[in-house]
């Protein structure tokens, strides 16, 4: 029930400098005051202004000291939830935070549900639903680029875009209703003007969807598989990109027998990099199992880095491997360019890999790596919106709502002048309702429950 008093530990479990127990509700200030002994005698928490701090001791129900704490007080409506909020900053560690939480629960404060603080912020009008969803995007961001996009959503960028679309759809609906209700005064619907506005909204939705696809890459990241025959430098490339010794590197072919993977940030894109076993014909059972796993990883990868050895040239093994990845999104890396003898020519590369990005370099001397990272970024973002004027992060729920709105608009455009105004109005309202699901104006309770279900306790 909104307004009742809730509490939860808001910091991650484990040892640390401090831990924070957050409380929100109508009576949390009074309840914390009962078990708080300020250092300065005569200071009452209930008399303090918002955005103030108080140092003292937090006690249990018997007024025995639990911990030295710093209380942060935020008064409604200028708090995260829009209600009175108290944050108890205690010593870090599981036990101090748990004891502080138990102490306030003895005063009649209940344990918060996952996402309940943010849900209250939404219900109290502090955040709209798009901003509330951005909170979890900020928490889960894997790179600075992804976090910056989430912060823009939290600041209301998505809401501004949706509000603009809603305003335009309301204008079209007003034109429609005026022609229906006041035909003598207003006259027939100006189909040309209505079509123009609907087309404008549709174009804007298309841009939002494209921008959302690009943001999805920054949020979820991509899987990149490194492949090639044994001893071409796959593990060396993994180590070079990670800037650490993750994979064992030897001159013995077949050293890597299982998938080695790690995360890396390439120009703001979270990349799960997977070093695969060298693909070749072998009688070794363990190596053969590793090769089979490699082929599975390659088939599931968003991008494949295919490595060639300039010293050995392109042989039949290389050609067989390339046949398996020919239809994949790929980059060819010609390695060991530091060798004096080079057995791969530009003409041969152009003939075998037409239209494929070729990067030449030496992993051991770290040449070509910057070009490779740039090529990975371009390959991943190929065809995506590049303009910075439409930077939004769109989740699956919002994407589905936009697609629904777009479908209604397309049906309206197709039916314009062919059906009655009443029938036309059905799709206009359908588009408005779909947009309202993004802004939160038309959200059902079960959808709200689903949105906040994925939040952690204490947020």
Curated annotation (Swiss-Prot):
UniProt GO BP: tRNA methylation; tRNA wobble uridine modification
Entries under InterPro entries matching the protein: G_TrmE, GTP-bd, GTP-bd_TrmE_N, GTPase_MnmE, MnmE_dom2, MnmE_helical, P-loop_NTPase, Small_GTP-bd
Keyword Transmembrane: no
GO cellular component, one term: cytosol
Alphabetically ordered keywords of this record: Cytoplasm, GTP-binding, Hydrolase, Magnesium, Metal-binding, Nucleotide-binding, Potassium, tRNA processing
Residues reported to bind Mg(2+): 235, 256
Family: Belongs to the TRAFAC class TrmE-Era-EngA-EngB-Septin-like GTPase superfamily. TrmE GTPase family.
Binding positions for GTP per the UniProt entry: 231-236, 250-256, 275-278
Role of this protein: Exhibits a very high intrinsic GTPase hydrolysis rate. Involved in the addition of a carboxymethylaminomethyl (cmnm) group at the wobble position (U34) of certain tRNAs, forming tRNA-cmnm(5)s(2)U34.
Protein name according to UniProt: tRNA modification GTPase MnmE
Annotated CDD domains: trmE (cd04164), TrmE_N (cd14858)
Assembly and interaction partners: Homodimer. Heterotetramer of two MnmE and two MnmG subunits.
Record localization: Cytoplasm
EC numbers: 3.6.-.-
Domain named TrmE-type G: residues: 221-381
Textual note on the cofactor: Binds 1 potassium ion per subunit.
GO molecular function: GTP binding; GTPase activity; metal ion binding
Cofactors, names only: K(+)
Coiled-coil boundaries: none
Membrane-crossing segments per the record: none
Protein source organism: Syntrophomonas wolfei subsp. wolfei (strain DSM 2245B / Goettingen)
Enzyme class at the top of the EC tree: hydrolase
